[in-house]
Regions:
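Nucleotide-sugar donor-binding catalytic core of glycosyltransferases
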Residues: 1-80, 84-103
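Short, charged, surface-exposed secondary-structure boundary motifs
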Residues: 35-37, 118-121
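Short, flexible helix/strand-to-coil boundary loops that buttress conserved ligand/catalytic motifs
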Residues: 101, 120, 134
Length: 160
């Protein structure tokens, strides 16, 4: 499963997932630009929010998060949404993942689409490993990345 805005790089990656036989569900409205109709079979053509989004994230076997290439030093909001929902996420590798995750980021990230496809297929065949990883990450995110934590962090920055 994935959701969000499509752009050329992301569209090519999603097409590669489908071409490799991965069952993909794509949420969000069809954009006027950068859309490839080969994604039609995966596209749910539905914008998701709130409880529905949380339910779909948690119910997905794997949430695929390929971040915008401009996010070289950071992660996107989806990274926090997915990990905070308890879902299993596979995302683009970023060096900052070492600081954000309680596990080796290599376990839940990819540096190429081929590596991403390989890891998706691996984790689909190893659900218990997927559950253990997502549970560990979820607990870490609840302990460290809630809005309460963010507010305290901002207040500390402001009043230094």
């Amino acid at each position: 499963m994935t959701y969000g805005t499509l752009y050329p790089y992301r569209t090519r990656m999603l097409k590669s997932l489908l071409d490799s036989g991965i069952n993909l569900k794509l949420y969000g409205t069809k954009p006027n630009r950068f859309y490839d109709h080969s994604l039609d079979t995966a596209n749910q053509n539905r914008f998701i929010t709130g409880e529905e989004k949380a339910r779909l994230l948690y119910g997905a076997k794997i949430v695929f998060n390929n971040m915008h290439f401009a996010e070289i030093e950071s992660v996107n909001n989806r990274f926090f949404e997915v990990n905070g929902s308890g879902a299993f996420q596979l995302s683009d590798y970023r060096p900052i993942l070492k600081d954000l995750l309680p596990i080796d980021p290599e376990l839940v990230s990819f540096k190429s689409i081929d590596e991403g496809i390989e890891k998706i297929k691996y984790y689909l065949e190893h659900p218990n490993e997927r559950y253990e990883i997502s549970d560990k990450i979820y607990k870490h995110f609840v302990d460290n990345y809630t809005y309460d934590h963010l507010i305290k962090y901002i207040i500390n920055l402001v009043y230094r």
